[in-house]
């Protein structure tokens, strides 16, 4: 009873802290003149990280197994993983360009875990025999850490595509405006239009420079976070293969979860390959990473919705790959 109450308190504290952090980010985004709010938001995410850590440890103590055996526990661990990724730039002494992705992701996953699932699904249950293995911690934690990193990296790539396509649409619109002007009005009016555009060149160049810097930072962090996630995913798949051989006598069985994990690994392997080719960097590699965003969610939730395969132990009861 004491552990359950403590878990309940820590859940609501962490959720409230992350909500405040997101509010601070929105305020600083809308009102640039307000300074000094970034540091409290960073401290807030650190506090939320420790609250979720305490929640997982508490659940580990009273359930007597590592809390990764059902959907609720995996979602809380996923939220914890987003909190870790949020602190990565701080460790490397970089500007935190991930906060706009990690904080909403953390609150979304935790919010769904606490409010979107039934109360019965919050209760810890005895592990089924297939999960009673030392590989549970290694395999599932690596997979969920990889999901968190790959989701963040994919969302950064989506943001890069949105900014790039908006820029291209703006350029096409201005070009069409001048082209129409050259045919619809007399030459003097067209020259006046052209002069006005040239007068705004310095302002547009300034905006384009900052847009270029933003896309470069998005590309930089997307590549590094996805590389980290790909490493975790590889370790998770390999450890899962060893566990499968112990449990089922075969390293690979091509059940739905394993198949989609392999598809996920392939998509991000292609992304990393495109990054080695300079001509494919930027938009092309971002498109591949954006496709990976959908693939990850299929891999994470797909088998649980279908309720089939070796990794399925009833609807929404296991997310161990």
Curated annotation (Swiss-Prot):
State the compartments where it is located.
Plastid, Chloroplast thylakoid membrane
Which spans are transmembrane here? 17-37, 43-63, 71-91, 143-163, 225-245, 258-273, 286-306
Annotated Gene Ontology cellular components are: chloroplast thylakoid membrane; plasma membrane
Keyword Hydrolase set for record: no
Its domain of life reads Eukaryota
Instruction: Tell me the InterPro entries matching this sequence.
Output: Cyt_c_assembly, Cyt_c_biogenesis_CcsA, Cyt_c_biogenesis_CcsA/CcmC
Keyword Transmembrane helix annotated = yes
Instruction: Extract one GO molecular function annotation from the record.
Output: heme binding
- Alphabetized UniProt keyword annotations: Chloroplast, Cytochrome c-type biogenesis, Membrane, Plastid, Thylakoid, Transmembrane, Transmembrane helix
Q: Which NCBIfam families match?
A: cytochr_II_ccsB
Family per similarity comment: Belongs to the CcmF/CycK/Ccl1/NrfE/CcsA family.
Among PANTHER family, the record links this protein to: CYTOCHROME B_B6 PROTEIN-RELATED, HEME EXPORTER PROTEIN C
Can you state the subunit structure given in the record?
May interact with Ccs1.
Tell me the protein's name.
Cytochrome c biogenesis protein CcsA
């Amino acid at each position: 009873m004491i552990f359950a109450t403590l878990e309940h308190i820590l859940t609501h504290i962490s959720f409230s802290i992350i909500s405040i952090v997101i509010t601070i980010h929105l305020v600083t985004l809308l009102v640039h003149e307000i300074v000094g709010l970034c540091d409290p938001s960073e401290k807030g995410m650190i506090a939320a990280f420790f609250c979720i850590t305490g929640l997982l440890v508490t659940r580990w103590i009273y359930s007597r197994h590592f809390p990764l055996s059902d959907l609720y526990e995996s979602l809380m661990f996923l939220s914890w993983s987003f909190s870790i990724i949020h602190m990565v730039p701080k460790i490397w002494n970089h500007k935190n360009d991930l906060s706009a992705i990690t904080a909403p992701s953390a609150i979304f996953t935790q919010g769904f875990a606490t409010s979107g699932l039934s109360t019965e699904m919050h209760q810890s249950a005895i592990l089924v025999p297939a999960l009673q293995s030392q590989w549970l911690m290694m395999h599932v934690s690596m997979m969920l850490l990889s999901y968190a990193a790959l989701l963040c990296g994919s969302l950064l790539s989506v943001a890069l595509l949105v900014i790039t396509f908006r820029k291209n649409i703006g350029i096409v619109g201005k070009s069409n405006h001048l082209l129409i002007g050259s045919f619809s009005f007399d030459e003097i009016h067209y020259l006046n239009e052209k002069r006005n555009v040239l007068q705004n060149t310095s302002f547009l160049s300034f905006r384009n420079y900052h847009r270029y810097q933003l896309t470069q930072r998005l590309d930089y962090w997307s590549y590094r976070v996805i590389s980290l996630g790909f490493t975790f995913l590889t370790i998770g798949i390999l450890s899962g293969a060893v566990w499968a051989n112990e449990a089922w006598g075969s390293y690979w069985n091509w059940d739905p979860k394993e198949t989609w994990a392999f598809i996920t690994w392939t998509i991000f392997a292609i992304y990393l390959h495109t990054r080695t080719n300079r001509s494919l960097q930027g938009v092309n590699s971002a498109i591949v990473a954006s496709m990976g965003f959908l693939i990850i969610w299929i891999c994470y939730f797909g088998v649980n919705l279908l309720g089939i395969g070796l990794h399925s132990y009833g609807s929404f009861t296991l997310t161990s790959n």
